[in-house]
Amino acid sequence: MWDQGGQPWQQWPLNQQQWMQSFQHQQDPSQIDWAALAQAWIAQREASGQQSMVEQPPGMMPNGQDMSTMESGPNNHGNFQGDSNFNRMWQPEWGMHQQPPHPPPDQPWMPPTPGPMDIVPPSEDSNSQDSGEFAPDNRHIFNQNNHNFGGPPDNFAVGPVNQFDYQHGAAFGPPQGGFHPPYWQPGPPGPPAPPQNRRERPSSFRDRQRSPIALPVKQEPPQIDAVKRRTLPAWIREGLEKMEREKQKKLEKERMEQQRSQLSKKEKKATEDAEGGDGPRLPQRSKFDSDEEEEDTENVEAASSGKVTRSPSPVPQEEHSDPEMTEEEKEYQMMLLTKMLLTEILLDVTDEEIYYVAKDAHRKATKAPAKQLAQSSALASLTGLGGLGGYGSGDSEDERSDRGSESSDTDDEELRHRIRQKQEAFWRKEKEQQLLHDKQMEEEKQQTERVTKEMNEFIHKEQNSLSLLEAREADGDVVNEKKRTPNETTSVLEPKKEHKEKEKQGRSRSGSSSSGSSSSNSRTSSTSSTVSSSSYSSSSGSSRTSSRSSSPKRKKRHSRSRSPTIKARRSRSRSYSRRIKIESNRARVKIRDRRRSNRNSIERERRRNRSPSRERRRSRSRSRDRRTNRASRSRSRDRRKIDDQRGNLSGNSHKHKGEAKEQERKKERSRSIDKDRKKKDKEREREQDKRKEKQKREEKDFKFSSQDDRLKRKRESERTFSRSGSISVKIIRHDSRQDSKKSTTKDSKKHSGSDSSGRSSSESPGSSKEKKAKKPKHSRSRSVEKSQRSGKKASRKHKSKSRSR
């Protein structure tokens, strides 16, 4: 083909140059009808094949290649390397374009038809384009089916040209073929003549010749058979393959649209069924997803195989494939990508979570056994043996140390967490206790304030009532004293003065005692003392006025006593005054009792508040004493045991006797010590009992004192009433006796009456004072009897004096 029996072939380059110049001005090669072009090329080839067969020498093959030249290898390129036109034609023009140099359709000469070849019928692999094989005898003949048809042979050497590997993106040196990579197979420089038999070909060559999508496609031009197709040049075959691929894409799009329409119908039906049914139902799964996944994998494989195969224009294919995608397809691909990404993310996250959970569970499970192994003596004994130490590895020890450190860290964290929880609980309890204590203190303060307010109000009310009663008594006394005789007034006023003086003394004592107890009580006592002093001053003033008024009326006494009407008036006024006095005394006694009861209640509360603190102190002191006693007893016992042991160690009989004596002495000492201890304990118990008895006595004395005060007041009131009654009886008897002795002269009667009245008035207060000093204060009956005896004695003395005169 190339040398034509040693002569260079000059028509092909010239025609090729003309065709290249014309092809540059043509339209896009994708718009060419490759089927018609292939048929025209086959027709021209058949027409020109007959002439070439006639002109061809016998020793040459139809392609113009000699057997010797094919076998010689690299030595058959001398003419081509020396020709300058050849290098000028191949290097600049073929390197400029990515499209192969297609021969012009109106070319006058075409390569001759091949010679006799043994063509094997197509095998089962119907899609492969290399199913035909040469005979073993013609193995070294140039193969028309490979991609080097229409170009220089593989062993032709050309100057170095930069190449680019589309698979890896790295520049490397030219192969031995020396031609541009888009038109020759990329790959490392191999042997000069690769094996052309199918069995000896590499697997990449077989994969390269197959179509990327193995789908049954209908071939429109039925005139072109598989055998004729193999005879076509590579650039025509590539054009045909492009056409077939476009047709396949169209068919796939139609099929996808049909499937989508079917899916939409099925989904509508499923939604209608779900709405009509009771519960929600899952959509029926179609085969569309799986088919799409398979198609994606096939497209990926096709893309990978397309990189290996020789493609004249890979960039325009991608550019043309992008606009061919519809919006629905793009959306569907985006959905698939999002599904893939979401599933991958979900799987990654779940894997991480499962790993961490399993790690935590494993760590918790291995905590306790790891500690037990570390602390066990059996493991230490095993590790101490020399033979067993070599079985362990460094990795296992590191892992154990890591586990131990992790377990220790977790233990520390747990302990800290527990400590924090306990501290928080303790702080909460303290706060609650403080709040409760504050509330109790506030309540106590409020109670004390209420009690003080009530006491003050009660005291004010009592003072007002006392002032009213005293005013009434003063008015009644003034009225009664005006009506009484001077003897009666003097006799009645003296016991009143004495009674008031005693009450003053008792009040002063009670005021002094209460002032020492509390400030509030001192205030109440001071107010009561001031009120009593004011009442006493008013009563004393009234008595003075009554005494002054009664002194000039002594002369008229005899005349008044004689009339019976005057006696009746006196008895009425006395009874009325007695009633008023009794009521006033009762009111005063009640008021005093109330005051004392309030004071006693306050003092009892204070003692109760103090008593638990005292009991606590006593219990603490008792516990300390008991501890000291126990410690001393334990020491004495230890000493005895030590002495006994020492005595047992000595083996001599003399020593035994001495030890027995010493033991007896020690026993006596211990007995004496025990006796002393018992005595001390008894004394302490007695002291405690005495203290308790003292407390009880104090309480009883306090109760008795309160009762005695009440009894004293009652007795004093009764004494006053008895004295007033006895004086009135004496006066009545004296008047009756004077009336019976009227037989004597008037002068003597007047003198005797005046003297006796003066003496009786003067003697009666003195005798009453002496008798008061002699009277006991405890029994009520004694006071009544003494008052009666004193009245009898006074009457007897008065009788004796009157008789003597």
Curated annotation (Swiss-Prot):
Q: Does the keyword Iron-sulfur apply?
A: no
Q: Where is the composition biased (Low complexity)?
A: 508-550, 754-767
Q: Where is the composition biased (Basic residues)?
A: 551-579, 587-598, 607-639, 771-781, 789-805
Instruction: State the organism of origin.
Output: Homo sapiens
Q: Provide the positions where the record notes the PTM Phosphothreonine.
A: 485
Biased composition (Polar residues) is annotated at 74-88
Gene name, please? Answer: PNISR
Q: In which tissues is it expressed?
A: Expressed in heart, skeletal muscle, thymus, spleen, kidney, liver, placenta and leukocytes.
Record bears the keyword Glycoprotein: no
UniProt KW keywords: Coiled coil, Isopeptide bond, Nucleus, Phosphoprotein, Ubl conjugation
- What is the protein name stated in its UniProt record? Arginine/serine-rich protein PNISR
Q: Where is the composition biased (Basic and acidic residues)?
A: 197-210, 238-258, 421-463, 470-486, 494-506, 659-721, 732-753
Where along the chain is composition biased (Acidic residues)? Answer: 290-299
Q: Which domain of life is it from?
A: Eukaryota
